Amino acid sequence: MKLNVNLPHHPYDILIKKGSLSQAGSWLSQLWQPQRVVIVTDNRVARLYAEKVKLSLEAAGFETFVFDFLEGEASKNLKTVNKVYEFLVKVGLTRSDGIVALGGGVVGDLAGFAASTYMRGVHFVQIPTSLTAQVDSSIGGKTGVNTPWAKNMVGTFTQPDGVLIDPEVLHTLGQRELIEGMGEVVKYGLIEDKELWDELSEMDGSPESILEHAESIIYHSCDVKRKIVVEDELDNGVRLYLNFGHTIGHAIEATAGYGKVMHGEAVAIGMVQVSRVAEKKGLMPAGITENIIHMCQKFGLPVDYQPWNEAALYQALTHDKKARGNSIKLVLVPELGSASIHQIPLEEMKEFLKK
C-alpha cells in the first residue's frame, strides 16, 4: 500500500508493506543516488535490525555507517544530538549524503532534527519500527528534542524524502510498547476517521488483534495525517487537530520524567481528562468521555495518572507550542469523527486539570 504526501515543495511517498525492511536498499535507490548514508538508531533497534538494513543498503551501492544511542525518551535531547553531529563529522558526511532514521518516535524525531540542522540540512528518510512512529511521528516533518522545560521544545519542520513502513517489525515490540501506539490510533478515529473508529470498536483489544489489524490501522492513520499535513504543513490550522489529548499529555510526560509515562499513554490520559472537563462545560457531547475511556481501556491504555499535580502540570503546559501570548489553542471533539479548535485564556487551563 502506498500513500502520497503531496506537498507542493516536497512531495514524498509512504510505503506500507510487510517484509519491506529487507528491501530498504532497493527502496532507497529509487529516492537517492548511491552515496554515503548514516543509519541513526537506538541500541535496542540496532540489535534487531541495523545489520539487516545496512546489508540491504550496501547491496544497493550505499556506503553505510551505523550510529546508535541508548534507547528511550531520556536520550531525546541536545546532548545526544551533539553525539550524532560528532559521528557525522567523523565519517565525513557531506550535504549530498543522507541519514536513515531507523527506530521509534524518539529516533525519528532526533535523527530528523540532526539531519535538518547538520550543515544546514541533509536529506533523510524514515523507517519507523514502533506503532507510534508508524502511525504518527514518522509522517509530516516535525523533528525535535526535549528540554528540561518542555517536550519537543527545540525542533524544526523538515520533511523526509520517504517513509518505509514494515508492519512485521511490530512483532518484536514489547506488549507495553505495542499498546501505547494505540493512543494515537484512537485519537485518529476520534478526530477524523469514523471508519477507523468502527474497526477499533469491532476488535477485541488484545495485542494479537492489534497485530492482525496492523496494516489497516497504519493505513487509515497515515491517510488521516497526510491529508491534514498537506492542508496545513506548519501547524497553524487544522494540523492542530492532531494535538487532541497532547496539551495535557505532553505536560504529563514532562512532569513525570521523560520515559516514565510513554507518549501514547500520556495522550490517552490527556484525551480522557480534557474530554471529561469539556463535557461538563458543554463543549463536548454527553457520553463521549465514556466512549473514549471504554476504547482506551479495551486496548490496555491508562486513563488516569498518579500523582496528579495540578500546579506542576499547569507550569509545564505554559511552555506548550500551542500557547499564544496569554491564550492557548485547545483541541476538542464536538462529535465522533470531527475536531474543533478553541482558543481559551491560558489561565482557564487550570480548570481542565481539575479532577
UniProtKB/Swiss-Prot annotation:
Record keywords: Amino-acid biosynthesis, Aromatic amino acid biosynthesis, Cobalt, Cytoplasm, Lyase, Metal-binding, NAD, Nucleotide-binding, Zinc
Protease as a keyword of this entry, yes or no, is: no
Q: Name one GO molecular function term.
A: metal ion binding
Q: Which cofactor does it need?
A: Co(2+); Zn(2+); NAD(+)
Q: Kindly state what the record says about how the cofactor is bound.
A: Binds 1 divalent metal cation per subunit. Can use either Co(2+) or Zn(2+).
Which Pfam families does the entry mention?
DHQ_synthase, DHQS_C
Enzyme class comes to: lyase
Q: Which reaction does it catalyse?
A: 7-phospho-2-dehydro-3-deoxy-D-arabino-heptonate = 3-dehydroquinate + phosphate
Record PANTHER family = 3-DEHYDROQUINATE SYNTHASE, 3-DEHYDROQUINATE SYNTHASE, CHLOROPLASTIC
Q: What is the name of this protein?
A: 3-dehydroquinate synthase
Organism (species): Streptococcus sanguinis (strain SK36)
